[in-house]
Regions:
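A eukaryote-biased signal for long
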Residues: 313-342
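Boundary regions of SH3-family modules and the immediately adjacent low-complexity/disordered segments
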Residues: 26-34, 39, 43, 65, ...
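Short, structured beta-strand/loop micro-motifs enriched in basic residues and often containing a Trp
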Residues: 40-49, 126-138
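Short acidic/glycine-enriched loop/turn segments that link adjacent beta-strands
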Residues: 74-77
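C-terminal motif of bacterial Sec signal peptides marking the signal peptidase cleavage site
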Residues: 21-24
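Bacterial N-terminal signal peptides that target proteins for export
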Residues: 2-14
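Short beta-strand elements that form the blades of beta-propeller/WD-repeat-like
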Residues: 273-291, 332-343
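Conserved beta-strand/loop element in small beta-rich adapter and peptidoglycan-binding domains
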Residues: 53-72, 139-201
Length: 377
């Protein structure tokens, strides 16, 4: 009897160990899932070995079926995938080259939130930077992919958030390790410790961006502000007068054309000069506050086609403005809408009418003002 009980206990232990093993393996990857290639180009290989053969080249945006995953000797995670080519090639690809369908779906939700908001500005990356699902960098869980240096995009909004304390993040430049790789932070920390410490900022700026498929399969996401260079159009960049341009839209743009093309790397180039509405913000050496306005002045720049020169059509008094900037109407009958903080601190919609006087000069009527036209004698 004792022998029978011992055998039964041993069998129960073996079954429990097998269940634990299977459960542990299932957490490595979700089977029957799909993913999209985020690398510009990558190879599906015959195995995870260094000497494995290349079976199929895939490009950014290609979809693959994820069947399993494993960890290589160097700690890199690899996915066993099936390609969507004619022969449905099966092989292995590094996990860092793949974005899961679940993450892509979350990025599409972000894009849907701002689908009706026109581009407020355009920008490009100063260096290779992470595209994230949320505006915070204390960890790597919200990283979707790493964007290449020089990547261009539309900016649809921005947000100031409390800056993480230095001990809460080792990614001061938002340069996180590749997904699936072993993190080795000790050397980085020692290097940072040898450098002079700069005063910690109390909060930091993040941009919410819209991206072309050629740049990222994820249509939207958040980028750490210090890695972004605003690409102010060459037509207006020399009209900055001590304040930074934070948003801009052409007033004479074809309404059937896209609001902003970011396919070309040099997104600051404009085909021809024109009239613009520009939102400005005063420069300051003081730390920015979380609740400060997005802009504090409106600048409308007209263009004289005959003399081929710009002129100031309107410059508002200082105000506390809130994005987004929306342009409405067609031809000479246009207006733009913003939000302005009132005395009670609540933003209220303000509509500015754009028109031309009898001499053809561009004018702007602020809310509550009538259009001023010069009577002909």
């Amino acid at each position: 009897v004792n022998t029978h009980q011992k055998t039964r206990k041993l069998n129960l232990i073996i079954v429990a160990l097998l269940l634990a093993f299977v459960s542990g393996c299932s957490t490595l990857a979700k089977k029957d899932d799909t993913g999209v290639v985020i690398a510009n180009r990558a190879q599906i290989r015959s195995s995870v070995a260094v000497v494995a053969a290349d079976l199929l080249e895939v490009s950014r945006g290609d979809v693959v079926d994820i069947m399993d995953s494993t960890a290589a000797e160097n700690g890199e995670t690899w996915y066993h995938v099936r390609g969507h080519d004619e022969v449905q090639t099966e092989g292995w690809i590094e996990a860092r080259n793949i974005m899961s369908q679940a993450v892509l779906d979350q990025a599409r939700v972000l894009a849907e939130e701002d689908k009706d908001i026109p581009a407020q500005a355009t920008g490009q990356l100063r260096a290779s930077t992470n595209l994230r699902l949320s505006p915070e960098r204390s960890g790597s869980e919200n990283i979707m992919m790493k964007l290449d240096s020089g990547s261009s995009f539309e900016i649809v909004g921005w947000k100031r958030v409390p800056a993480p304390k230095s001990e809460e993040t080792t990614f001061e430049s938002d340069d996180a390790p590749k997904p699936g790789s072993v993190q080795q932070n000790s050397g980085r920390k020692r290097k940072d410790g040898d450098e002079p410490k700069e005063p910690e900022e109390t909060n930091e700026l993040w941009y919410k961006v819209r991206l072309q498929p050629s740049i990222s399969p994820a249509p939207a996401g958040w980028i750490y502000g210090k890695q972004v260079e605003l690409t102010v159009p060459s037509d207006i960049i020399f009209y900055r007068t001590g304040r930074e341009f934070v948003a801009w839209q052409r007033l004479d743009e074809d309404p059937d054309a896209k609001s902003s093309e970011t396919k070309d790397k040099d997104v600051a180039k404009e085909s021809k000069p024109g009239s613009w509405v520009i939102l400005e913000k005063s420069s300051s050496n003081e730390p920015r506050k979380l609740d400060e306005p997005d802009f504090d002045r409106i600048y409308v720049l007209g263009y004289d086609k005959y003399n081929q020169e710009h002129y100031t059509a309107y410059r508002s008094p200082d105000l506390k403005g809130v994005l987004p900037l929306r342009l409405q109407g067609k031809g000479d009958s246009k207006n733009f809408v913003i939000r302005v903080q009132g005395d009670d601190g609540q933003p209220k919609e303000a509509q500015y009418t754009v028109y031309r006087d009898d001499r053809g000069n561009l004018k702007v009527a602020a809310p509550g003002e009538a259009q001023k036209t010069k009577k002909k004698k």
